[in-house]
């Protein structure tokens, strides 16, 4: 039996969005779902206990960063990532490919893998599909990702075509190198940029390998949102309906809703935690930059429509004071709220799918959030 299986519960009659369950060795996940990012085996400023209070069903950790610090051998010796960080719910690890391509200016791509420099020390390193599998097998995540090439946006077709073909060959090597298929699921990644024919080629190549799940990569890399939505519209239908679909690196509220409408089941992004550390909060009425001076005497909650612990307990004025003084507690509060907001949003999305009204929900949410305004500020 596969380590991870997908169960389709319902398709929204109004939108085509999917309500489902993802069964993993560490529990069942309700989808569509947002996955908080715990890059270094921690979601910044949050404890595992708080993540459970927030409603986090699954988190993501980063292969590249854990390879460098503390080292996958140490995590393996601890009993795997779940034991190491005291998290007994599912974990997804990315392959490290995105970091190799985004953090290192000096890199050389060859058929065997990628030569690059450690972004911390400048040391020369090499990562191959086999190496990415070895690291993730040691980490022991429930879901692993194949090692892929992550092209920039925009990229010319002449660059993208051989990149897609290389990603397909690397996917085959990942499958062969994967040592724990009975308790770790390996997902394949569809690439191809904004080119429909290359996305189709990539989807055909990758789905022919019969992975237990599929990700759409190469989005949220600087392209306009209408380009991303168009890519989803012609890529998602190419993926098997009985397997989970994961949109990598996407986490703004509008993109989560629009992704679900286009058949996506899983999302991850550093956005809610990163902007929280800048004093920016997601609220039902739009973006709120709590460090701004106008909140110095504002004794309301961050979001009067939110029932999270932070909004029930602390004021904008207090949180602004903490953030302005660089107090860690302030960043803990903004992070807690932002994660709660997105996880509650996905819960509402699931309910809207169940009620066959996701398009209506989108319209209501966008109107209240301000996305329908001509000069709407997104993240």
Swiss-Prot record:
Residue ranges of the region described as RNA binding: 249-255, 273-277
Protein task: Catalyzes the base-exchange of a guanine (G) residue with the queuine precursor 7-aminomethyl-7-deazaguanine (PreQ1) at position 34 (anticodon wobble position) in tRNAs with GU(N) anticodons (tRNA-Asp, -Asn, -His and -Tyr). Catalysis occurs through a double-displacement mechanism. The nucleophile active site attacks the C1' of nucleotide 34 to detach the guanine base from the RNA, forming a covalent enzyme-RNA intermediate. The proton acceptor active site deprotonates the incoming PreQ1, allowing a nucleophilic attack on the C1' of the ribose to form the product.
Keyword hit for Metal-binding: yes
Active site residues of this protein: 94 (proton acceptor), 268 (nucleophile)
PANTHER family named among the record's database cross-references: QUEUINE TRNA-RIBOSYLTRANSFERASE
Note describing how the cofactor binds: Binds 1 zinc ion per subunit.
Subunit structure: Homodimer. Within each dimer, one monomer is responsible for RNA recognition and catalysis, while the other monomer binds to the replacement base PreQ1.
Class of this enzyme: transferase
EC number assigned by the record: 2.4.2.29
Cofactor(s) the record lists: Zn(2+)
Recorded GO MF terms: metal ion binding; tRNA-guanosine(34) queuine transglycosylase activity
Protein name: Queuine tRNA-ribosyltransferase
Binding positions for Zn(2+) per the UniProt entry: 306, 308, 311, 337
